[in-house]
């Protein structure tokens, strides 16, 4: 049988029993071992063919000659990839898969919550509420509707599509970019290649960064992009802090070149008390909670079930990382 190692550093006590039930349903085809990183026995490492983990330390990886699949449970795997992860000592390739899609519902609702807050002044009313101030006149020229606006979603993957679907329900026009614009991409009115990314920026009232962080996507949004904004534009980052140039975004929003910013991810987390983000003008900050939802492990279990079924049937696995990125 194939040996599966769950690197469980206290994520969720239900995770082990849930994965156990999934593995048992394959009638002995797979065997599950669950250990914390520090406690994995040598013989288990040598047998392991599939790893389920948040990250796989290189020290453990080197002791796994038979690895076939690494299944991360995060959608972003920046900082978790290294050359020897992809190839065994005998030259055999290893599949690396992400948790893409697990977070789609929560991340997309998170972005919509920020958008709606700006459109309807919820954050302004909240401040006024705490100050016991009736702020109707102050808000009068700041409110608008999402309906009729154009949203540009940079990264039209599973999270990007979930955002687009919800934006369309609000009557917004959806434009996206992705590496392969020929791929079928539901919920988008227009899909552009990353080369046409500045066309998206010019067309958008709201811009959402929903990409993984790779060497190609780092500092994707900065001074140059802020300079070409043609209208009051709101910018949201649900991906990673490294996708944009924080210094220029802060300067842009504080000087009014960017209408408002919604941000869930930062270069430094937790955000230190003296960070300029806390005092940025018209900015909504959330503490990297976009992916948080109570069904998280259930969704991860469903992904593992799909992967094991594919392996059992000799079909390709999903969510695979392209090692050339």
Which residues does each PLM region occupy?
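Rossmann-like adenosine-cofactor binding region
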Residues: 179-276
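Glycine-rich, N-terminal phosphate-binding loop of Rossmann-like dinucleotide-binding domains
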Residues: 55, 74, 209-211, 238-239, ...
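N-terminal glycine-/charge-rich "phosphate-binding" loop or analogous flexible N-terminal tail
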Residues: 1-48
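Glycine-rich NAD(P)-binding loop of Rossmann-like domains
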Residues: 93-95, 125-162, 190
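Conserved beta-strand positions in the Rossmann-like core of class I SAM-dependent methyltransferases
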Residues: 175
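Rossmann-like dinucleotide-binding domain for NAD(H)/NADP(H)
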Residues: 96, 232-234, 238-325
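Oxidoreductase and adenylate-handling cofactor-binding alpha/beta cores
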Residues: 108-124, 168-172, 302-315
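Phosphate/diphosphate ligand-binding glycine-rich loop within oxidoreductases
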Residues: 47-129
